[in-house]
From Swiss-Prot:
Protein name (Swiss-Prot/TrEMBL): 1,4-alpha-glucan-branching enzyme
Binding, substrate: N59, E60, W88, A89, P90, D115, Y116, G117, K118, E330, V331, L332, R333
Species of origin: Felis catus
Gene name, Swiss-Prot/TrEMBL: GBE1
Family indicated by similarity: Belongs to the glycosyl hydrolase 13 family. GlgB subfamily.
Active site per UniProt: D354 (nucleophile), E409 (proton donor)
Disorder: Defects in GBE1 are the cause of glycogen storage disease IV (GSD-IV).
Catalysed conversion reaction: Transfers a segment of a (1->4)-alpha-D-glucan chain to a primary hydroxy group in a similar glucan chain
Lineage: Eukaryota, Metazoa, Chordata, Craniata, Vertebrata
Length: 699
């Protein structure tokens, strides 16, 4: 009799079966041998994914048809001018359509009950063939629950919802314009290295109000293009009743937020970005939903289990929101159709999936430290229904548009999250490197500059699995929110309000802040990943935190804005940080370090506070020492020949001290140093980041 296999082990026969079932599992295990004991988990996940895909094929005609739910569910104009309506409300006793078209008579247009909890209604056109429910009409679905309660609801498939005056709840507005927006530009090519500008339309104006899609299109997109970003991540687009939720309490999943304008204006924004060569990603929230019932998904059919788990499992205690039941056939249809809707109707080029950690585990990541022990990523704590949904979503996105981009926000470090589905992975293109901003905040908050640990910085910036692509960032919207601080605020604090004028001498605080702000962002950009992200305004050290209007601040918009005009004022030092960000991005576009293999770090010297590495044929040198500069400092390189400075944080246009002569040529010699065959001598002043390029390199 064979010996029993302990948890965390895998018999040879079981491993062989897993390798036979998962086409490229061998490649995954070759890249990460520590995953070998969990081969059966990958086998089970992959088989379950294929079973679900095959079931969709047998029962729905394939995922292509299945993901077009928005073409039949909701309300649609027919060729004859009539209206076809369809809903899924398994807990309802009766379903009706009402609105201003029938003077809000709740029961005059009943739906017909179909199988599997579906209901449909056909409303013929008027005798003159005109529409009974014209564009802009207000509508409601009326639900008669099994207990006899009459509920007024917005269709989960509503394409546009609006709130007028002092109304607390949103209204469903029928969106069927006579002249819908026609896209003029094709999608841009997939960037070889993504440089993402994390954006929020509503806060994009310096005025104390909610900005519009049009404002963003005509005033912010040109700035993004000028700064050298090739991708924008649009936050808070899916409709959310509570503005201060930052777009993370979704009420209408198919509706573009009306507080910024119309659906056609959002399409113009995306199309204009495409004309500039900018890829557009949507921040998609499928990890949870708002608890709102009158203008949300919650209790749509009068039960708590329509789209969500019933009972405690259906509630996220920390977020005070509802949790989807990913094993439900109709929930899968709803979510996959939602993904496709944003790709096809609005022209988005991919997604950043929010709250993936919460989806992956039954514990939702709450109270979990995630030590990196691989047993934390497998077993009963994993919500495999949610995992299969994410695999299906990635499969759909990359099948429809192979050049699309998907990014996972996962703090746990789930292995194979960004591996191909054929390897047993989940299929994301990138994951967010969420430990990096925490490290910078920790250093600024807890350590003196002279106590910064160079090895620890390098470890944090390079701690990623081989061939698992990461989006690096020094800070995102999370650090900008009230209760936290941006890097600029940690560095310069209150002096940002008094000492940013070029007419006044540098104070020690402002000098330190401006120099370290550039260095932190450059080393994160160059060493931290295969993509880079910045939250709007942080590139120039935006002087205030972010706080949306709410009761606690008397509904003030003062901190819910971005003061881009500060960079346009020649008398303020914000322009220096803005200039640096632009040139850093444009140099990456030219040299392509984000798409190059991971850097070779040749030096992390604790006493000298020096970090040196090579990537994409460039030599990066950072001197984090607060006071020591070094002449003739030897730095290793693989390349012989002549080098020149191509980026210098100490340059005058970046608010530096101009201590380096850019006409200087550096010659490497065949003198081995720090495991490099060649080396060169450089002058590296304190608090300076430097990039050298071999003059014989093609770029």
């Amino acid at each position: 009799m064979a010996a029993p296999v302990a948890r965390g082990e895998c018999s040879e026969a079981a491993l062989a079966a897993a390798l036979a079932d998962v086409p490229e599992l061998a490649r995954l295990l070759e890249l990460d041998p520590y995953l070998k004991p969990f081969a059966l988990d990958f086998q089970r996940r992959y088989k379950k994914f294929n079973e679900t895909l095959n079931n969709i094929g047998e029962n729905e005609g394939g995922i292509d048809k299945f993901s077009r739910g928005y073409e039949s569910f909701g309300v649609h104009r027919c060729a004859d001018g009539g209206l076809y309506c369809k809903e899924w409300a398994p807990g309802a006793e009766g379903v009706f359509l009402t609105g201003d078209f029938n003077d809000w008579n709740p029961f005059s247009y009943p739906y017909k009950k179909l199988d599997y909890g579906k209901w449909e209604l056909y409303i013929p056109p008027k005798q003159n063939k005109s529409q009974l429910v014209p564009h802009g009409s207000k509508l409601k679905v009326v639900i008669r629950s099994k207990s006899g309660e009459i509920l007024y609801r917005i269709s989960p498939w509503a394409k546009y919802v609006t709130r007028e005056g002092e109304n607390v709840n949103y209204d469903w507005t029928h969106w069927d314009p006579e002249h819908p927006y026609k896209f003029k530009h094709s999608r841009p090519k997939k960037p070889r290295g993504v440089r993402i500008y994390e954006s929020h339309v509503g806060i994009s104006s310096y005025e104390g109000k909610i900005a519009s899609y049009k404002h963003f299109t005509y005033n912010v997109l040109p700035r993004i293009k000028d700064l050298g970003y090739n991708c924008i991540q649009m936050m808070a687009i899916m409709e959310h009743a509570y503005y201060a939720s930052f777009g993370y309490q979704i009420t209408s999943f198919f509706a573009a937020s009306s507080r910024y304008g119309t659906p056609e204006e959002l399409k113009e924004l995306v199309d204009t970005a495409h004309s500039m060569g900018i890829t557009v990603l949507l921040d998609v929230v499928h990890s949870h939903a708002s608890k709102n019932s009158e203008d949300g998904l919650n209790m749509f059919d009068g039960t708590d289990s329509c789209y969500f788990h019933s009972g405690p499992r259906g509630n996220h205690d920390l977020w005070d929101s509802r949790l989807f039941i990913y094993s439900s056939w109709e929930v899968l249809r709803f979510l996959l159709s939602n993904i496709r809707w944003w790709l096809e109707e609005y022209g988005f080029d991919g997604f950043r999936f929010d709250g993936v950690t919460s989806m992956l585990y039954h514990h939702h990541g709450m109270g979990q430290a995630f030590s990196g022990d691989y047993h934390e990523y497998f077993g009963l704590q994993v919500d495999e229904d949610a995992l299969i949904y994410l695999m299906l979503a990635n499969h759909l996105v990359h099948t429809l548009y192979p050049n699309s981009i998907t990014i996972a926000e996962d703090v746990s470090g789930m292995p194979a999250l960004c591996s191909p589905i054929s390897q047993g992975g989940v299929g994301f293109d990138y994951r967010l490197a969420m430990a990096i901003p925490d490290k910078w905040i920790q250093l600024l908050k807890e350590f003196k500059d002279e106590d910064w640990n160079m090895g620890n910085i390098v470890y944090t910036l390079t701690n990623r699995r081989y061939l698992e692509k990461c989006i690096a960032y020094a800070e995102s919207h999370d650090q900008a929110l009230v209760g936290d601080k941006t890097l600029a605020f940690w560095l310069m604090d209150a002096e940002m309000y008094t000492n940013m004028s070029v007419l006044t001498p540098f104070t020690p605080v402002i000098d330190r802040g401006i120099q370290l702000h550039k260095m932190i962002r450059l080393i994160t950009h160059a060493l931290g990943g295969e993509g880079y992200l910045n939250f709007m305004g942080n590139e120039f050290g935006h002087p205030e935190w972010l706080d949306f209007p709410r009761k606690g601040n008397n509904e003030s918009y003062h901190y819910a804005r971005r003061q881009f005009h500060l960079t346009d004022d020649d008398l303020l030092r914000y322009k220096f940080l803005n200039n640096f960000d632009r040139d850093m991005n444009k140099l990456e576009e030219r040299c392509g370090w984000l798409s190059a293999p991971q850097a070779f770090v040749s030096e992390k010297h604790e006493g000298n506070k020096i970090i040196a590495f090579e990537r994409a044929g460039l030599v990066f040198i950072f001197n984090f020492h607060p006071s020591k500069s070094y002449t003739d400092y030897r730095v290793g390189t693989t390349l012989p020949g002549k080098f020149r400075i191509v980026l210098d944080t100490d340059a005058a246009e970046y608010g530096g001290h101009q201590r380096l002569d850019h006409s200087t040529e550096f010659f490497s010699q065949p003198f081995k140093h720090n495991e490099r065959p060649c080396s060169l001598l450089v002058y590296i002043p304190n608090r300076v980041g430097l990039i050298l390029q071999n003059v014989d390199m093609p770029n």
